[in-house]
Curated annotation (Swiss-Prot):
GO terms for molecular function: RNA binding. InterPro entries: Hfq, LSM_dom_sf, Sm. Homohexamer. One of its GO terms (biological process) is regulation of RNA stability. This is RNA-binding protein Hfq. RNA chaperone that binds small regulatory RNA (sRNAs) and mRNAs to facilitate mRNA translational regulation in response to envelope stress, environmental stress and changes in metabolite concentrations. Also binds with high specificity to tRNAs. PANTHER family: RNA-BINDING PROTEIN HFQ. GO terms for cellular component: cytosol. The lineage of its organism: Bacteria, Bacillati, Bacillota, Clostridia, Thermoanaerobacterales. CDD domains: Hfq. The gene is hfq. Belongs to the Hfq family. Residues 10-70 form the Sm domain.
Length: 85
């Protein structure tokens, strides 16, 4: 995998962030959080919900469900930011 190519996880999170798609995040303890992804890195996701920000560690996340389908192809290389090498 080249340095400028995103993995599927990053492509998905980046698209829901850029398109401002609401998500439901299920944690491994069964708790649910609903909101909008504002940022992420290798270890955490920042979720904005009801005017508050939550930093969620990725190892605590079980599932992320977007409110509508997300096209991860665009984020993986179908746009000018991430061209295939």
């Amino acid at each position: 995998m080249s340095k400028n190519q995103l993995n599927l996880q990053d492509a998905f999170l980046n698209q829901v962030r850029k398109e401002n798609v609401g998500v439901t995040i299920f944690l491994i303890n069964g708790f649910q959080l609903k909101g909008f992804v504002k940022g992420f890195d290798n270890f955490t996701v920042i979720l904005e919900s009801e005017g508050k920000q939550h930093m969620i560690y990725k190892h605590a996340i079980s599932t992320i469900i977007p409110q509508r389908p997300v096209n991860t192809y665009l984020a993986k290389g179908g746009n000018e930011e991430n061209t295939p090498s």
